[in-house]
Amino acid sequence: MATINVYVFAFIFLLTISVGSIEGRKLTKFTVTTSEEIRAGGSVLSSSPPTEPLESPPSHGVDTFRPTEPGHSPGIGHSVHN
């Protein structure tokens, strides 16, 4: 009798989960404003001035990055002091 109750409970539980995912959420309608509607409400701003190119970061030396033995990695944020 107890095993039947467990199966009934599991069936009802799975049924309620599936019903919740089937219903989902309601989507609301929204209107898309067109460029004509935006221009009618105010003036159009000019585009922003071009930006200056960024400098490339400095290059690193050969000794900056080196391989470590497996199991002996210092980890992120820790330097190796020999």
Curated annotation (Swiss-Prot):
It comes from the Eukaryota. Induction: Induced by auxin, but repressed by potassium (K) and nitrogen (N). Accumulates strongly in the roots under nitrogen depletion, and in the shoots under nitrate limitation. Also induced by osmotic stress (e.g. mannitol and NaCl). Strongly repressed in roots by carbon dioxide CO(2). The modification Hydroxyproline is found at residues 67, 70, 74. Mostly expressed in roots. Present in lateral roots (especially in vasculature), root-hypocotyl junction and cotyledons. Residues 40-82 are annotated as: Disordered. GO terms for cellular component: apoplast. Residues 1-24 form the signal peptide. Residues 25-63, 79-82 form a propeptide. Extracellular signaling peptide that represses primary root growth rate and significantly inhibits lateral root formation. Promotes shoot growth. Modulates leaf morphology. Regulates systemic nitrogen (N)-demand signaling. Mediates systemic up-regulation of genes involved in N uptake and assimilation pathways. This is Precursor of CEP3. The lineage of its organism: Eukaryota, Viridiplantae, Streptophyta, Embryophyta, Tracheophyta.
